[in-house]
Amino acid sequence: MSKSKNAKRFGTRWGFILASVGSAVGMANVWGFPNKMGQNGGGAFLLIYLLFVVLFGCIALPAEFAVGRWAGTGTLGSYARAWRSRSPKAEKAGGALGWLPLAGSMCIAIGYAVIVSYVLKALVDSVTGTLMTVDTASWFQAFSTKDFSVIPYHVIVVVGTLLTLLLGADSIEKTNKVMMPLFFIIFLVLAVRVALLPGAAVGYRFMLTPHWDALKDPKVWISAMGQAFFSLSVTGSGMIAYGAYLSKEEDVVGVARHTALFDTIAALVASLVIIPACFSYGLDVGAGPGLLFVTLPEILQDIPMGRLFAAILYMAMIFAGVSSLQNMFEAVAESLLHRFPKLSRKVVLVLLAVVCLGAGIGMETISKWGPWMDLVSIYIIPIGATLGAVSWFFIMKKDDLLAAVNTGSGKRHGALWYNVGRFVYVPLAALLCGVALIAHVAF
């Protein structure tokens, strides 16, 4: 199979890692991780989460990077070639199955763009000072319960993100080399500021003290596993596209470990900001989206230089949101360019803008956005992720997968790596999918 046009490679190893970290770091790190940590035993949840990050970061993520690089293309082409590895007759079936995880990328992008639009509004209102003088709950309710309330922000987010994809891997790399370092710097600054709040130490103790009884609760294990799995963007789609742009000289397991490490650091630093701040003010750390748009603004209103800290907080969140959207959109764009080679990248990006805004503008209220994200998170994404896991470790020939993983590797990965993937990672992916479908749990 030929490579999709415009599928330029990432120029540097760190450019690839930062782009992958950008995909993985997102809203789930800022409100999802602290929320789940707060509800599932604090330090005990953290220990379980780290265990699964190591597993998925060493097995699942490298597999997706490797398959994309081996196929030389993204989602649709990679599934087709993986299934062809087993039998040429299976190629069409694999290509057809690839549409499901690809649809997951597009559907999650449609909903994700809405919440990033909320963040952009919060950033603008922080800069103007409006957010510092209002009742935060009323402010949030005013636009989150009203149709067509953030259209200008919505258009800016979608069009602005798609413009960063004009040059493919090259422009993705350049933007993430700026956004990701700034994201970490901003959250480190915020963490230092929060450390000075009275009562912050109580939040640190909660975070770092394991409540061992929580280890006996299967729900805690499932929650930590799901958070680790999807926080790393192991969805059977997006990371495959980035893998297609990775040099064959790079070690996919090594870059995957770095991606997992920085994604985990992002989650921990976000928790060091949010959990101690909430404990200091006696506020609920498990407030979901309200945490970002009601709880944190309320805290920022009360501290010196709160307007400045609010502005940099929401700027960091814009970086996290845009870098994640880049991966979702690029996965779809690359596959469409591969499947329909007569299309130009500009035409495809315009098409994505029309679809994203056409579907997303009608769900700008939380009451419509929530069910949409639940639909995607409970059904489409888990099934797509499981299809990917099964395709790599049960359909694709073992020798082909190991050759793909070992390309550029200084250390050979053999039967142990493969068997952990086949008999541990795949069953866990299927378990998460089953829990999502049967118990209607969104990870």
Q: What residue spans do the PLM features occupy?
A:
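Membrane-embedded translocation segments of transport machinery
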Residues: 2-6, 10, 14, 173, ...
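Inter-helical loop and helix-membrane interface segments of multi-pass membrane transporters/permeases
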Residues: 4-7, 36-40, 73-100, 113-170, ...
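Loop-to-transmembrane helix boundary motifs in multi-pass membrane proteins
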Residues: 9, 15-17, 23, 150-152, ...
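Transmembrane helix-loop junctions in multi-pass membrane proteins
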Residues: 27-43, 160-173, 192-204, 216-218, ...
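Hydrophobic transmembrane alpha-helices that form the core helical bundles
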Residues: 57-76, 81-82, 92-139, 318-337, ...
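C-terminal membrane-solvent junction of multi-pass transporters and transport-like membrane proteins
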Residues: 97-105, 146, 329, 333-353, ...
